[in-house]
Amino acid sequence: MANAIVEKAKERFEQSHQSLAREFGSIRAGRANASLLDRIEVEYYGVPTPLNQLASITVPEARVLLVSPFDKSSLKDIEHAINASDIGINPANDGSVIRLVIPALTEETRKELAKEVKKVGENAKVAIRNIRRDAMDEAKKQEKIKEITEDELKSLEKDIQKVTDEAVKHIDSMTANKEKELLEV
């Protein structure tokens, strides 16, 4: 039972890391990256549909994204969804594909995005601490109902803290890498 608590915490930490990676992927760093468009949903026949299900997204050049719809009739809807999103890129529709030219980031924009990255990283750490608290509470509950001994509880708490520290270190590393990527000129 004790190992199950640690394994469950590890699993939830991994989900937090994946969520953070997706979040960082959607923060543009001056380079074209298909994940910039991951959050965009297109009204397609009245149903909100993720853009990546309606079109192939390629990166032909370092700062250009090419959106090629599978159904050409959805071109206008895709263009409208990109315009309505908060990514700050204007689509250029040439009748069969949509070109997105990623503008160079100004120093001020880079610093703002770096602040945003720090904030997102801090939120991920809060999520990690909440997962740790849940695991600790579960361990104490197990000790209270005599499923584990007091010594096993102390050992379990150390294990939980160890995996928590590793998860926080991983988040710090991910945050530092994204900040470095943003501040590169």
Curated annotation (Swiss-Prot):
Record localization: Cytoplasm
GO cellular component terms, A-Z: cytoplasm
Keyword tRNA processing: no
Gene3D superfamilies in alphabetical order: 3.30.1360.40, Ribosome-recycling factor (1.10.132.20)
GO biological process, one term: translational termination
Highest taxon above the source species: Bacteria
CDD domains linked to this entry: RRF
One Gene Ontology MF term: ribosomal large subunit binding
Keywords for the protein's UniProt record, in alphabetical order: Cytoplasm, Protein biosynthesis
NCBIfam families, per database record: frr
HAMAP family reported in the protein's UniProt record: RRF
Name the UniProt record assigns to this protein: Ribosome-recycling factor
Organism annotation: Streptococcus mutans serotype c (strain ATCC 700610 / UA159)
